[in-house]
Amino acid sequence: MKRTKTIVTKLLLLTTTAGLLFSCGNGGRSETLSETTLAIETETVQETTELEARQAIPDELPERDFAGYEYRILTYSPTAYEVEELTGDVVEDAKYDRNLKIGERFNVTIRAVPSPGIKELDKELKQSVISGDNAYDIAIPHQITSGPGFITSQSILTWNDVPYVNPDKPWWNQTINETINILGQQYYMAGYVTMPTPFCMFVNKAMLADQGFDDMYHTVREGKWTIDKLIEMTATVSGDLNGDGKMDSADRWGISFNNDNNTLNFMYACGILSVLIEEGRPVPNTNNDRMIAFIEKLYELYHNGNRSLVTTYQNQGELGMGGFKDARILIKCGSVSDLAQLREAEIDVGVSPYPKWDEAQERYATHVDAWNGMLCIPKTADNLERTGIVMEAMAAETYKYVIPAYYDVALGTKYVRDTESMEMLDIIFASVVYDFGYIFDSWNGCTWTAPNLMTRKSTNVASYWQSIEKKVTSHYDKLYAAVEEDIAQRAE
């Protein structure tokens, strides 16, 4: 959609005003200054806004009538995919309008079937496939809990042969096609439709200025936000506030993160994936010089200099977020969803991506938590054209309308306090990566090299890899064999 804008110059405004004054001052004469001395032209300009350009991208879907079909999505986050009525909340109303528009276009009703939890969803889908009841068109499982198991149990189809799903469209994550496949088989898809909440960092801007680092946003823009810079910034912040001679959660810290996914995300931010795909086969990316150098650098941040308050996954809210809100922590690692917790905070909060490994690294990178599920197709799905068309439409409409509402209206007006942080969010959302190992590792240790070694206060990558190599190799051999079997069966 293009907006036509007529540009009227200040000179024209001045001329009109002068003409009115001239008319009034000459006994009601109708002649104006513009009529006698000036010829003013207006210029019509076609201007397309970023939002209009986004919404103008065609989904290239055919017209179909699915005769009132109920399109069922199995999920533990039902409100992301179905909203029953308009509520006045801009994001929820955008989801409602999305489904209504798709429903009218294709004569379908979109239904989110809620599961009480991640394990229950895993069990429900597998049982549904075994019974052959075709209960669901799409399932959105927890990445780690169900990622490999749905493949080895042959519970899902691949997206490769689903018509009308175009992974090159901007509403799909562009890295997942390269990193989450085996022998070219794409069992999972992800994009804006799953409402990702990537990991990021929150910064106390007043503390930052006190430390002499008051232009962090410029550092990010220039590509100079690196792990070395983070170590430098957090080196002199910590202090024993209560004077008890020890550093604990009541004191001042340079940075805080949990010993779980916050720690793991440093690896992704530094451009490292735990598993690579070579000739269609998963190959662990653990015991090498790059990982060793990263682990040594992370150890410095983690354990040296009393700069880091490391929490558990369970107490990160109380200790990490609590200390950040109380202005005792310079930088807090978290995810974009944590912005809601900071809405009423009295400190001046900024947002930034995780740091890169070095300035030579081309782009910033971040991951999403496993709770940001991925899309898969139950093996019992009986109409792949319908499956593809409706999901492609949902992905496209989410990208065009729901995400702008969430991003610009909800984040921009409710949570983010400065334009620079919105700029940082642009960088963060554009840098989401998916790691084969994170999804398919099944807690076997390959992906969690960094958190596990940091917990053990060790940098001995070789020893760690030796302790898990047999288990990891066996795990991926079984996964690879399951895909080979699936390909063979479909070829029969």
Named regions from a protein language model:
Residues 51-71, 76, 116-119, 143-200:
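Hinge/lid segment of periplasmic solute-binding proteins
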